[in-house]
Structures are given as C-alpha cells and as structure tokens.
Amino acid sequence: MRRIKKLVMCSPGDDGYIDYGSSIVNIVKYTSRDKKVLRRAIKPKIGSGRFDVAAVQAARLITHEYTHYLDLTTTVWGLEFIVRRNLAYQAIDAGADIESKAVEVAMLNYAEILMHKGLVKVYGHVPIEDVVTKHSLSRNEKYGTIIMIHLMKGEGRIADVPVSMLSLLEANAVANELMGEALWIERVFGEVSSFHKNRISSNLDSIMKNVNALEYNAFHLLVVIHFPRLTIFDRLRLVGAVADFALNISGMHLSHVANTIFRSILNSTLRNALCNELCRGMSRQVVAFKVLLFIYQYTQENELSDEGVSEKLKSPLELICSALQYFGCDLQAVNVRSMSDFEYCFSVSMLRGLRRKFEPAGHVEAMLRNRRARKNTVFISEKFGFLSCLIFICSTISTSRCLIDKDSIFGRIMSPFMMFIAS
C-alpha cells in the first residue's frame, strides 16, 4: 500500500490532513477498499434509526478536513494565503532563489501556522481539568509579537499555548466536525437525543482534556472557561463564529478592530507592534482571541443571561458587531460582509492573473460558488443539503470515482476538491 508523503506545511493529524502547499486533502485512515464505509458516512440512510459507529467516525474525519479546505479557499485569509503562495511558486519557477521578495512574503503566512509547534510548551502530562487561564504578550525574534495562553492549575502551570493561526483553524475544524456529527445523527434519527448530545459533549471534553492536543483545544478551552453554562452546540457555534469573523474580515475593518485591540493592551511597545501587524492583514488569530474576550465582557457587563447569549448566537455576526461597538468599534454587519466580499473578489482577480499551472482547471470558479453557498452560516454542515457538489475520492492508481451525489450528507459541494486515499 502506498501513502502520499506528508510534508512540513500540513495540518496535524495521523488520519487525515490538508497540505497547505497544494490545497489538497489527504485521507490516510481509509483506502479504496473502505468505499462502503465512506458512502454510509457521506450518505446516511435517512430515518433508518441505525447508529453506525464506523460511518460516524468517517463523517467526522471528512468534515474536519473539508473545513480546512473551505477555510483555505473561501475566506479572505485563505485567498491571500493562496495568492502569496502561488506568487512564490511563480517566482521560484522563473528561477528566483528562496530569498526573493515573493517567497519572503509567502513565508509570513506560513509562519503563522508553523509557529504553534515551535512555541507550545507542556510542563505536566496531566488531564486539563479545573484550570484557569492567564494571558501574556511577548516578542519572539522568529515569529514577532505573540499572545500566549498559560493554563494554570492551582499554583502550577500545565502548559503554554500560543494564539496561532493553526490553533484557530483546528478549533474551527473541531467545531464543524462535531456539528457535522450532530447533523448525521439528526438525518438518521430525526433528532439529536439527549444521549447523543451527551456523547458529542463527551467527545469534545476528551479533546479539551488532552494536553497533547493543544492545537485543537485552545479556543474551546477559552469558551468553556468563560461561558461554562452554554450548551455544547452554542459553544461550538461561538467558536465557529469568531473563527469565521477573523478569517473573513476585510483589511479596512481589520484596521478598525486593531484600534480597539490597541486600547485594550497596556504594554505600549508590544501593542504598537501587534497592531501594526493587524493593520497589514496579519495575526488574524489575535482578532478571534480578543473578540472572544470582548464578547465575554460585553455579555457580563450587560448582564445577558445564558438564554440571551444563546438567542444572539442565532445571528453571530450581529453579536460580534454589538460587542465591538460596546468597546468603541462601530462595525455594521452588512458592511462587514460587503467589504469582505469585495476583498475576496479582488484576491480572486489576482489569482486569475497568475499562471494557471498552479491551480487545477475550474478551481477558482469552484471557490467562488462555495463561498456564495457558505455565506450565511459559520458551519459547513448547515449547508450540506443545499450545495452543489462533486468530491472526488482519487486512488493512487489514477482512478477517479465520484463518491458523493446530490442526496448525500454533504449535498453537492463544488469541485474540484480532491481527497487522496491510498489504493
């Protein structure tokens, strides 16, 4: 059995991952012999009332990795990443060395993902339970201005976790993965019973307690610490909302948010450096982190009940804009969306202007259609039944089969999205 070699610029995970250098998802856990399980995962029998453990596990994995693909191809952050990446490829293809300007610019985006592994520190291999968080701002010679989350238990420190782009992307993928599982259950049973809610909540708890999964659980830990009484699905919705906002906010509005963040930081030297990075369109993970804390303070000082927060999460962008407005950043949801669309389309025009050898035929058009389909929800699972989709499961023996049809759990998501499995 042959496996595609995992490169440095990939998401973590042994069962599957996205290669950020090519935008291709690789599913390692399954081979072409597992197509029956994959079909049951993608196309559950509606109303069957049969819980299929293997199919649910496959659905979770595919949803997790597909979230990475959509975050890379349908967000303002993702398109900037791809444009810079392809400009670097074009420069190298033309004979430029690795110290060329295009490569250096692309490495700024890569560094935001790579920094997590270089900065995370674990002091005790114990379950993450009954912890509190402390936050610090520091300057790192290699990665610039960094916000660190310190996980404290009693007088001891369990771990230091950087607020990295990787931690934001993985938190969003986990949120979508678990919401996707809930959708699978709803399709099969007609509802998500208390038993399955508790089971999904237990799955999230196991992720949050794992000190070796800090790239996955950092943002989820922040949410459960600050909003302990929200339901499991409201907490997932909140993580998805702040991730979607941070990945899609336009450069102009990012500067407005940077000014608000600036006022919330006491260290004048470091806040200047951090806000300069934000004004250049970098450090979007910091936006998610600070917006989450702004929402917490906004709900506390306005004495919003858990039910009130839950109600506002039905329109998460409105909640985020209300929280920012409370701290002096006047953003209107409709303007946030329109400016985000404008900047995304500008990046698309740049991508079309590059040599097409770095993107497969039809990929740019697929990105645009997927973005339109994803526009009004923070969860990809909420649109699965309404998208137009072709996902190809390609074996390494050069055989392509269309595995997903219009009645699948994924609906019909626009191709080309390629998942490679071993033959």
What is the role of each PLM region?
Residues A159-N172, M208-L214:
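Active-site metal-coordination segments of metallo-dependent hydrolases
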Residues M1-T63, L72-V76, S194-S423:
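Non-catalytic terminal regions of proteins
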Residues I92-E141, I295, D306, L319-I320:
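Low-complexity, serine/threonine/proline-enriched polar segments
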Residues L72-L114, H150-E155:
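Post-HEXXH active-site segment of zinc metalloproteases
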